[in-house]
Amino acid sequence: MDGLRQRFERFLEQRNLATEALGALEAKTGVDKRYLATGAATLLSLYLLFGYGAPLLCSLIGFAYPAYASIKAIESPSKEDDTVWLTYWVVYGLFGLAEFFSDLLLSWFPFYYAGKCAFLLFCMAPGPWNGAHMLYHRIIRPLFLKHHEAVDSIVSDISGRALDVAAGMTKDAGKVSVNQLQKAK
């Protein structure tokens, strides 16, 4: 528990948008920013558990900060932060795909959105206990390496067929257009 408290304290010492807002609120109210941050986290948690807009809030948490951090990573000269956020987006995408098929059932479970939000926060957590990194290296990457050649072959075949169909449709549309123009004259 002390490790979590120390990380929380270190977070509050960093200079970022959240800590600046907490500092301004602390100056106006006289309430310590640790209590303000704890209160905000508690309200957020309660809203995720019982609030009407929990799906939207959870989606914003899972998308807004990672999108911002991804843009910062793209603009930075380092490749390592790019890899961190690409890994997150791979896991996020696969989670979204799995959720598409199970959401109707899972959304009826109590505290589903709180659990989903906790999972997404786990996936974007900094440091060695980053959930996206763990899931990618333990599950996704081994499956990818095992099956990527077969998937590449299927995708190549499908894209070739799609191009053939599109070319045929374009030809047919051109013929129909020419015929219609000739009939109109």
Curated annotation (Swiss-Prot):
An annotated GO BP: detection of light stimulus involved in visual perception
Q: Function, please?
A: Required for correct function and survival of retinal photoreceptors. Required for retinal development. In rod photoreceptors, facilitates stability and/or trafficking of guanylate cyclases and is required to maintain endoplasmic reticulum and mitochondrial homeostasis. May play a role in clathrin-coated intracellular vesicle trafficking of proteins from the endoplasmic reticulum to the retinal rod plasma membrane.
Q: What is this protein called?
A: Receptor expression-enhancing protein 6
Q: Which residues cross the membrane?
A: 43-63, 89-109
Q: Which gene encodes it?
A: REEP6
Q: Which UniProt keywords apply?
A: Cytoplasmic vesicle, Endoplasmic reticulum, Membrane, Transmembrane, Transmembrane helix
Q: Give yes or no: UniProt keyword Transmembrane helix.
A: yes
Organism of origin: Bos taurus (Bovine)
Q: Which InterPro entries match?
A: TB2_DP1_HVA22 (IPR004345)
